[in-house]
Regions:
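Generic detector of well-ordered alpha-helical packing
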Residues: 51, 55, 74, 129-132, ...
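N-terminal subdomain of lithium-sensitive/metallo-dependent phosphomonoesterases centered on the IMPase/IPPase/PAP
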Residues: 1-127, 299
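Generic C-terminal helix-cap and adjacent flexible tail
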Residues: 2-5, 183, 306-311
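DPxDG-like acidic metal-binding loop motif
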Residues: 121-184
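An extended, acidic
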Residues: 192-311
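Residue-level signal for inorganic ion chemistry
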Residues: 21, 25, 50, 61, ...
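Short helix-loop capping/hinge motifs at secondary-structure junctions, enriched
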Residues: 176-179, 184-185, 213, 300-303
Length: 311
């Protein structure tokens, strides 16, 4: 039986949690040194700040929904006594796939489970405690906290807090998506809307994974096709923020492959709740188990899909 949750109350509480984590990250950045950076894989970094932020978030989310499990990027939830299904997961309630098996060229877990699957809880938090770690290290905006709540394959809540601009993007299923900001007169909130740009005037974000060898044919085809034929192309270094920028109409489309569920899950709901379109690279709207995302205003979705399918 599906569990009934007060999604509005839960979402606003998650916004507060994300802001607290963001305040921690902002404070630690003022005293951060490169000596504290670790390499997970080639060009893929993690710091004590990622792990500290994740512990803060997991602790608060456990209090909010004690029955929920976790998919987290840094794998701290299991250390603190809560099952952490780090890595690629089945989201149909039947089980969770481990991350201890073979890696693809970009370091992400393959979709084939290396071990027998274990039962998954009906509710899962998907957490990226610091999306855009390389940006953070270099003091280059944006970087963000990303938190999503799943029930089966359905994304119920998405919250992304951009630390440098102090903007919290959020959505809960069926209501729309919003952004809140702290201003002199207090906290303000406004509804988000995707753009209405067509492909010839579109501003696209084409992200490169940290190890892009396997992605070179696709990104080359994307750039060769669209460079000079769209408004412009950008890279921003944060999947969560690229999705939020699409939702806010600041970008018209975004495409990336070889990314984790924590990178895109929250932002994808935010895009969809504004009327945008999100699929994987095959064009499937059942993108929650994959490692590729295309998100657009809906108008240019087929333009991007046609190119990635032919790469």
């Amino acid at each position: 039986m599906e569990q009934k949750i007060d999604l509005e109350r839960c979402t606003l509480t998650v916004c507060e949690i994300a802001r607290r984590a963001g305040a921690y990250i902002r404070e630690e950045r003022s005293k951060f040194s490169l000596e504290s950076v670790e390499r997970k894989h080639a060009h893929d970094y993690v710091s004590y700040v990622d792990k500290g932020s994740e512990r803060l978030i997991v602790s608060a989310l456990r209090e909010l929904l004690p029955e929920a499990g976790f998919i987290t990027e840094e794998g701290t939830a299991d250390i603190e006594g809560t099952t952490d299904f780090e890595g690629t997961t089945d989201l149909d309630g039947t089980g969770v796939r481990g991350c201890g098996g073979a890696r693809n060229d970009c370091g992400r877990s393959n979709l084939v489970p290396p071990y027998p699957r274990t039962p998954a809880p009906p509710l899962l938090w998907v957490v990226d405690p610091l999306d855009g770690t390389t940006n953070f290290i270099h003091q280059y905006a944006p970087y963000a906290v990303s938190i999503a709540l799943l029930q089966g394959r359905e994304v119920l809540i998405g919250v992304v807090y951009e630390i440098c601009a102090d903007e919290c993007f959020y959505a809960w299923k069926g209501v729309g998506a919003f952004v809140s900001r702290s201003e002199q007169r207090g906290m303000t909130s406004e509804r988000l809307h995707v753009s209405s740009q067509k492909i010839q005037d579109a501003l696209l974000c084409l992200q490169l994974p940290y190890n892009s060898d396997a992605y070179k044919p696709t990104i080359k085809r994307l750039i060769d096709t669209f460079y000079g034929n769209v408004g412009s192309i950008r890279m921003c270094g944060s999947a969560a923020m690229a999705l939020c920028y699409v939702a806010a109409g600041r970008l018209d489309g975004y495409a990336e492959q070889y990314i984790g569920q924590w990178d895109y899950m929250a932002g994808s709901l935010i895009v969809m709740e504004t009327g945008g379109t999100v699929t994987d690279y095959s064009g499937s709207s059942d993108f929650t188990q994959g490692n590729s995302v295309i998100a657009t205003n809906g108008i240019i979705q087929q333009d991007l899909l046609t190119v990635v399918k032919s790469a």
